[in-house]
Amino acid sequence: MKKMKSIIAVVLALVLAFGTVTCAFAAPQSGETEQTMSVAQAVDTLTQSAKEKGDCSDGDCDYSPVIAVPGINHSPTYLYDENDNPVLNKDGKQIGGSLLIIDTDPLVEIILKKLALPLIKMLVTQTDSGFPDAVYDVVSELFSIQSCDKQGNMINNLKTEEYGSLASMDEDTRAWAYRMIPMQKLTNVIGEDHTYFFTFNLVGNPIDSATALHEYIQQVKKETGHDKVSLLNVSLGGTIFTAYIDMYGWDDIDEVVNAVAATDGSDIIADFFTRGAEGFRIEDEFLYHEYIPKIIEESMDSPALGYLINILIRIIPHQVLCDTLTRAMDGIMDTLLVNCPQFWALVPSDKYDELSKKYLSSPEYAELKAKTDRYHEAQLNLRENILEGHAKGVEINSIAGAGLAFGDVEYSYFSIIRSAETVNSDGIIQLSSTTMGATAAAPGEKLPEDYEPVKRGYMSVDGSIDASTAVLPDNTWIFVGQHHEAGNNDVVLTLACAFITDPELKDVHSKPDVWPQYNGTCRTKELRRWLLPDAYAVKEEWAQLSPEDEQPDPADVAELDAAIAQGEEALNMTIADAEKADAATERLTNILVKLGKRSPKEEQSQIITVLEPVLCALSLVALRTIGGNGYSDVVRAVIKGVISHI
């Protein structure tokens, strides 16, 4: 699946607008014993809460129900015909998806029918030959299922799956929900019957989605007997939260946890709407040498193929390539982005006026602009609305990743965005959006020496971030080096759970040794999702052995037990330590490989190892000698020069 993403990213280079740092803060050396005790106490608090949790009905428990308002890839949506009958593909499966809904059955036929002949003509004649327009037609058809009209309404009959509590889900759906948002630490305490999963349409209207959330909240209150709910807003869910509180206020809300939430959009979408050299990094060196290898390396662990593509892509004349990418982008803009209110909700508030004037000034867009204007109003009211909720006693905490450029770590195709050069982000959403106002220098840089924070005591140690400008600086928690895919870091998951379940954790001053305002990054997903479950399964297998069966080597038993303990310790960290997480991952992997439960990691092919620097050098030579020109451009220039001297 990841390789397919890379292929699509290469083919559509500038088109894809969708998804999801090498140093991390280590645990402080001083006060290590006291900190270890504090961490243990924090974990014990969560464990004790889980033990004390019993059946809850009629609102007679300590925890209000939590509603997850999820991200961009978390709301399965399906295509229906005009009679509300499911539309099936040739295999009898309903057409749908949680991100892009594409009917792949006719894809090859469409490409062959519309692209093959123009492509051949273009390559043979080294001229346009209608190829860019053919690409526009294919892209438009590719994304047509989720297209909206100029009023901002979905053209097709799309219905989004709706869910209740995790307890009400079937086993497969519940497992899927946990994969989308790893909430096990939360449900272990408050129960699956008190954890709900709201969904909304990716190409809908955020104002309508906020209304649906309000109705959903009333139903949850009725089911659980509570008079308030808590909201866990994840990524794109932040746009629905922004609209909701502007429309309905705080009467139904107990607590709010914003987890990498897009409360003020993403510069990625703003740059896609901006387009051209102001929106994209289309300089020759980046486009013809750096970009494609970066995408390829993410999924193939080597950029070699990317450098080869750099060399081959010059078969296409420079202007034809530019025109092709432009028309591909036109296809996305015309069928999906411009007409979709939800994507306009991802335009940061300070860029909305300029971009809406650019695209929505025509009278035919009046209805759509009324919808986008209403959401923009909610964006502008966000600070005031948050302060109002805080004054009413609603606990509102924000978790954010920082220190990365767009396209860092994962989803490297976003590195094409111009803002990648200047904006501090989690790789997907800028820090100012996920923190509701924190100030930050560009990735890898520091704030100016003469910078004056609004309030002392909220700067990062390296001087790159100031949380004092956030709406609620005391409730803003920043993980430096953390990518937007925060589910990879169990420290983030534990903190999100603690906000709701630990009554002593009120703000960044409550337990600074356990939960510092500035944390780090680590990758524990493999431990949680695969390695530890596999290790537990081995232990269970051994427990089922009879005395007559061959017994495991005592040394292996001891090593597996030690590796499990080390892995569990890594999952319970409250201060992210990448070295500890990696060491635990490596140790569990090694013993499972030894026991035959996992395959050893494949080493990179010697051919690739040899070819990579060679292809990189050839790509660089081409860049230095002919710049952004195609091969035929150079030939034409040479011929023209020769003729001029005859």
List where the protein language model places each region:
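Short alpha-helical segments and helix-capping/turn motifs at coil-helix boundaries
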Residues: 12, 42-55, 377-386
